[in-house]
A protein has these predicted regions:
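Cytochrome P450 core scaffold surrounding the K-helix E-X-X-R motif
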Residues: 8, 99-105
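Flexible, small-/acidic-enriched active-site or ligand-binding loops
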Residues: 12-14, 65-94
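Conserved hydrophobic/aromatic beta-strand scaffold that supports enzyme active sites
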Residues: 12-16, 23, 41-45, 59-61, ...
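Short loop segments at secondary-structure junctions
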Residues: 20-22, 47-51, 64-67, 91-98
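A short core secondary-structure module
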Residues: 27-71
Length: 248
């Protein structure tokens, strides 16, 4: 979906799919494709009618190895470094009409928005796990590390930090689970709650992991412990599947 000039503004994408008989010819460049180098099948959004704006966007299934489709450079990301994130290029890439999602043109943008509604609680769950892991490490470390003749956790200022971290995590957990239950129940109008869960859980993850680094002191800034990785991994959850500013 994303391109160099169209991230949050997904409706402004420039990749085109021009009909040629019973085929479509794709031309364009895609950015920020998670698992871009390892996937075998891709959903590609392109303009089939540029004059209609977002209503002219259609979705296509494109398989790896299709002539004209190549995987580009891998991004050097700050976090989630085990996940390959790649650029994708389409140059006169021919796909048959049978690979038009939904069987008709113009439904791509709606398809993308419905997909994101269900993906955002997943990102929220990812963030929740990062926050929970950071809290557990922080509790363990502050209960063992001694300063000024007592454990770090014995200081009331540290207890307040840990209490806030735990409170925010539990609030995020309820939003994540509630949105997941609605999806499992077949609810269709989930856009608002999905956005709320995504915003709150990912902001919580960023705060909690940052505070955990602080509680570890110098060790939090090193790779002796996984805390610095949690903080780096948490950052992307505020960005992908719709930035938190757009969700608000």
């Amino acid at each position: 979906l994303s391109e160099k000039a169209s991230g949050s503004d997904a409706g402004s994408l420039r990749t085109t799919a021009i009909r040629d008989g019973s085929d479509f010819i794709l031309n364009g460049h895609k950015k920020w494709n998670t698992n871009g180098a390892v996937a075998s099948t891709y959903t590609v959004y392109a303009l089939t009618d540029p004059d209609k704006g977002m209503r002219g966007i259609s979705a296509f299934i494109v398989e790896k190895g299709t002539p004209g489709f190549t995987v580009g450079k891998r991004e050097d990301t700050m976090g989630i470094r085990t996940v390959p994130v790649n650029e994708l290029d389409f140059v006169d890439c021919r796909v048959p009409e049978s690979q038009l999602v939904g069987g008709k043109e113009g439904g791509g943008f709606r398809n993308a928005m419905m997909t994101l509604d269900r993906a955002r609680p997943g990102v929220a769950a990812q963030a929740l796990g990062l926050a929970q892991g950071a809290l557990e490490w922080a509790l363990r470390y502050t209960s063992e590390r001694r300063q000024f003749g007592q454990t770090v956790m014995s200081h009331q200022a540290i207890q307040f930090m840990l209490a806030d971290m735990a409170t925010q995590i539990e609030a995020a957990r309820h939003l994540v689970y509630t949105s997941a239950r609605l999806i499992d129940a077949g609810a269709t109008n989930i856009s608002k709650l999905a956005a709320m869960a995504k915003v709150f859980a990912t902001d919580t993850a960023m705060r909690v992991t940052t505070d955990a680094v602080q509680l570890f002191g110098g060790y939090g800034f090193c790779r002796d412990y996984p805390i610095e990785k949690y903080m780096r991994d948490a950052k992307i959850t505020q960005i992908y599947e719709g930035t938190n500013q757009v969700q608000r």
